[in-house]
Amino acid sequence: MKTGTLPAYIIAWLHLVGLDMPQLSELYRIDNFIDTFALGHYARVLAAADLRSGNTVAFKVMRPEHLDSNGDMRWEYRAFGNEAEILARLRHSPNIVKFYDFGFISDREEAPRNGEIISYQSDVRGFLEALSRYAAAGWRPYLTMENLPRSHSLFYLMKPNSPNSRWRLPSEEGLALALQFSSLLSLAHGMQIVYLDHKLEHVYWDGVHLKVIDFNSSRRLENDRRQSPQQYTKDVHNMCVGVLYSLFTGMSPQKTSLRPQPSSREAVEARYTDIDNLDFSMEPSLSEGIAELLQRGAAENITTVQEFINGLQRVATQHGWQFSDYLTSPASSQAREQMRAGLQRLRQGQEHVREARDLFREALIQDGISRDLEDELRRLVVVLNEMLNNRVVP
């Protein structure tokens, strides 16, 4: 039996008595970085193949600069334990990224390739108990999770590629995303967990389903009853300001074009504290009901996520949605179904346009093509880029 297939507690014992440990390359094939469009403070993320399961995964490993020379656990080290515990508690939600494995590696290179590894897989308790031991040894924590397509990252999709470009989600999709996100917060708050780190970089959306990543900065409040109500209100505030405002307007809450938000512990705490008024002047077509609801959240006039959900459902009925407590007209309901079908076809059409453009680009780099054919291919690429720059759905 290979050491990489042994239980983590046996491998840990092997480590303690000085026997051979499994190598990183026995468990994972590490590929390229996949976080370059939105770098984080705590960790780097690489594509990897789990050689035990055959799954393609995202391999998230703590940045080497967060190792302490004295073997102490800095906040960034503890954050991996915090994330592991919260992911385990929320694992039944369809809206969080799936996790597969937690563990530690000895390689201190930013992009690890070699060295030893201890894998706890889904044994979160064992991983948490081992944190201090492997911090003292100078090993870095890692976790693996499902590798979500970059094409589903809202920040990647909505980030402008020219000074005058800006995209927003259609209101139908924005409402669907907001309902799923607030449902996730409702589940988390029921477990005394606040997410806090709301930004587009952490939001993945395929037009139907929401996935949220990065729970490093999330917090459990079980020993802080006095502050809990304020923290729940702040979580709703951060969702309205940091995610929903941007996806409905295509703008940063700092009243600039979209840009990466700072991600250190201190930055997460302070990121939106001074934002209590949202500017919707650049998106006059946005429903007044949506704008008013988000403004109430920004002003912290919504104290619980359930209050936000109730308000969101009332607003959504004006867009053809139907709920047990809030009704819409039959005509609006039918029109919404037609709009949903149209948006689905629109997404498919835009994807076909991208595929056509990429085929033309590949043809352009062929050696020996005629000048006339080259000119026509360039013309088509330019026209399709213009179509995509003016697309309806990010």
Regions found by a protein language model. Give the residues of each.
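C-lobe/activation-segment region of protein kinase-like
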Residues: K211, F215-L286
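Terminal C-lobe "cap" of eukaryotic-type protein kinase domains
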Residues: A298-Q322
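Activation segment signature within eukaryotic-like protein kinase domains
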Residues: L177-A178
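Juxta-kinase regulatory segment immediately upstream of eukaryotic protein kinase catalytic domains
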Residues: M1-D35
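ATP-binding glycine-rich loop module of kinase domains
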Residues: Y42-A88, I96-V97, D101, I105-A111
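Conserved protein kinase catalytic/activation segment
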Residues: H202-D214
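Conserved structural core of kinase catalytic domains
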Residues: Y100-R168
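Catalytic-loop of the protein kinase fold
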Residues: A188-W205
